[in-house]
Amino acid sequence: MKIALLLSGQPRRYRNGYKELKKWFLDRYDIDVYLHAWEAKEFHKFNFFNRGKLEKIHRVDEDLYDNLVNWYRPKDYLFEKSIQFDKKDIKGKNNQRLNSQMGMWMSLKRVWDLIDNSGIKYDLIFKTRYDLLFTHRVANTCPLLEDLTQLDPEYLHYFGYADNWPHTAYQMNDQIAIGGYDVMKVYCNLFPQMLNTIFVDPSYSDNYEDVFINETLIFHHLKTNNIPMSPIDSGFNGIRGLDCGCSIMR
């Protein structure tokens, strides 16, 4: 089975993030890695749950980008100067910023273009981030950690929310996504049409209270494109948090 791992976004907490991916995936499977990362001297982490205030500034190591290449040994990669998409600080009621949204989805589009240009049609494609913690957040018996190759490539797999999460009907966890080429092509190509979806498409803007939430945006995108989805049970039944899966290392 040909497997590709896509990493994109801001490479915060990349050292521990690499250890996690190495432990659970890179050491266990034959995986081709593709990287896209934004280049900057520092990355800002905002807290959506505290009125969008700045929570932490991550200083960039001088050897960060060299380390990414040396450690992951990617099939292909692109490091690109950070782009300011929005100077007006547009954000929704839940404090997610349009600028951050566009950076996230454009980075994913960039790394998808790398894999597409390779000409290799992978059986399974795994999209993730640089800063995720799986250990003690996801059970060893979870299908993702037990045997990645058993996931059906016809479906888009993602961590399911806890049963008591009130927005399950129209949101999905966006930390990871796994599927075959066809479903992942749709997932990774949200960026070219996201502004039209947010600001023009009435089927989106008229149906959701906050149009600037990534979890709502990607769920709507997949539903609109008739992509079959299959939530992954983390194995802890929600007792480790509503996201029911890996956590972002702050």
Task: Say what each PLM segment does.
Residues 14-15, 130-145:
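Acidic donor-binding/catalytic loop of UDP-sugar-dependent glycosyltransferases
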Residues 1-19:
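N-proximal low-complexity "stem/linker" segments adjacent to membrane-targeting elements
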Residues 19-31:
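Short, acidic, metal-binding catalytic loop of nucleotide-sugar glycosyltransferases
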Residues 148-171:
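A short, conserved acidic/glycine-rich loop-to-beta-strand motif
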Residues 2-3, 30-31, 121-123:
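Local beta-strand N-terminus motif with an aromatic residue
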Residues 36-119:
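Active-site-proximal specificity loops/subdomain of glycosyltransferases
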Residues 97-114, 119, 133-139, 165-250:
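Catalytic core and acceptor-binding pocket of nucleotide-sugar-dependent glycosyltransferases
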Residues 121-133:
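Short beta-strand-to-loop acidic/aromatic patch adjacent to the donor-nucleotide binding site
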